Amino acid sequence: MTIHGFTCIEGHTEGMPVRMVIDGAPTLQGATMNARREDFVAHHDWVRRTLMLEPRGHAHMSGTIFYPPVSDNADFSLLFIETSGCLPMCGHATIGSIAFAIEERLVVPKRPGTVTVDVPAGQIVARYQTDGERVTSVRFTNVPSFLLKRDVEIAIPALGTLAVDIAYGGNFYPIVEVQPNFPGCEHFTPDELLAWGRDVQRAVGDALEVVHPDNPAIRGVRHCMWTGKPIADDAHGRAVVIAGDSLVDRSPCGTGSSARVAQRFARGWLKEGEAYCHESLIGSRFIGRVESTVRLESGVDAVLSSIEGRAWVTGRAQYRVDPSQPYALGFSLQEFVN
């Protein structure tokens, strides 16, 4: 491997970092973004490690790779990368990447005010608002989301027995609602929730096989959502989302918000069209809604949800990858813990 360079746009969505690669990314094989994701995982995961992990990234880094559209009707494509892996979908990164692409003039949408984006989980349509050259909000309609399992009983050492709902919003989420052994996320530290989130992921994986009913390539649990009382009086819920071994989402989590909207709708706690203000650990917020109901090819009932949020560009960066340097392809502290 020779010295390689990447150009990235840096920013954040409601407090959660988004690093969007706009130059230097590998050419991927496949007719769809799902197939190209599989090619990336098999042959190019060093790119993710290099840009997401230390020393160029950190334990909570998240990002995308900007690609030309795969479909004729799309404006561009996105591949989602973060410390935990290459994801089928990431909502906060979608909001950020759409805002960045428009503000930095990487794309001229076919329909002003609307963009269509190819992603591994499918195709999403987003509407955006502007004030001059600034994108002030992005509202995207996510892939079909659904409640896969309810009241799955698991046990973790710190809290004992828990009942979790498993919902899909582009990724699978065990959702831990307030219950006897869990009084709410506001009662615990982020470090505690991170450690216990890893335990929940393992416990769910031991309890059952989690597979998308229409797409067996989407499987397994790499997230956990701890819920609790919101900070603001006008918010409806709060969540601390854990991804993989080390990431604590600073935003309310886009795919997690879609999963929670789908869960609440399936349980009768949310009506179609009703706004759900979802707070994060730091009090930032997304607005989620059930836009319509759909049925998957497998016959599973699902919803099309929209998630609305804001993002900001903080700069541009050039990254140099020299294989002769130590830790050139990134490292995680977790790799050095027995």
Curated annotation (Swiss-Prot):
Q: Name one GO molecular function term.
A: 4-hydroxyproline epimerase activity
Q: Which Pfam families match?
A: Pro_racemase
* InterPro entries to which the protein is assigned, alphabetical: Pro_racemase_fam
**What is the active site of this protein?**
C90 (proton acceptor), C253 (proton donor)
Tell me which residues bind substrate. Answer: G91, H92, H223, D249, G254, T255
* Top-level class of the enzyme under EC nomenclature: isomerase
Q: What is its EC number?
A: 5.1.1.8
Record keywords:
Isomerase
What is catalysed by this protein? trans-4-hydroxy-L-proline = cis-4-hydroxy-D-proline
- Family from the record: Belongs to the proline racemase family.
Q: What does this protein do?
A: Catalyzes the epimerization of trans-4-hydroxy-L-proline (t4LHyp) to cis-4-hydroxy-D-proline (c4DHyp). Is likely involved in a degradation pathway that converts t4LHyp to alpha-ketoglutarate. Displays no proline racemase activity.
Q: What is this protein called?
A: 4-hydroxyproline 2-epimerase 2
